[in-house]
Amino acid sequence: MFIIIKHGDNQEFLVNSNCSVLLLLHYIRKKMKLRKTDTIDLCDESGTMKLLFLSKTPGDSASKFLTARNTYYVCKVERGAPGTRIENSYKAIVPMLKNPEPELVDSLRTQCDFLERSRIKMLRTLEAKRLAAMESSVNLPARSPKGGGAQQTTSTSSQLKSKGGRSDEDGPPSTRRPFYKTRADFLKRHR
């Protein structure tokens, strides 16, 4: 289950894809002397990205996403500047090749635009849900009595009655305890 990774000036190396996505990306970064914080991905020869960097479960086997004996290019995913409002935006996806084909660059640019539009759409959806939740909690309708509030003829003594049928005038309700806390309590009471 090997794949060919091409980069730079027509350089290539073999990678065993029978490992986790996390380990595969780590190995490629190390082999190409990239920083650990660099976001990279692989694309096939037609420019279709594999989106390994977006994997929800990086422990999954990379062979699920990659075809054995195929050639893949390393691409660097450029995001917004850290600490800014556009920190998570997709700025560009750049193939790590000296002279990439124009079709490859166009395909990656199209996919980058699509990723950014999807990210913005998701943010707008989340913001709309958050606003709807806030509005519904702020604008809760006040409950009014069924009779309209004008006809309230309950006596004060019936208002003082609790669920047990006792009135508050009888004193505080007795504390209710479980019959038996432990097996020892049960045996004490029945001997």
Curated annotation (Swiss-Prot):
Residues 182-191 have a biased composition (Basic and acidic residues). Coiled coil: none annotated. Residues 137-191 are annotated as: Disordered. GO terms for molecular function: RNA polymerase II cis-regulatory region sequence-specific DNA binding. Signal peptide: none annotated. It comes from the Eukaryota. Pfam families: Il2rg (PF15874). Disulfide bonds: none annotated. One of its GO terms (biological process) is gene expression. InterPro entries: CXorf65-like (IPR039471). Residues 151-162 have a biased composition (Low complexity). This is Uncharacterized protein CXorf65 homolog.
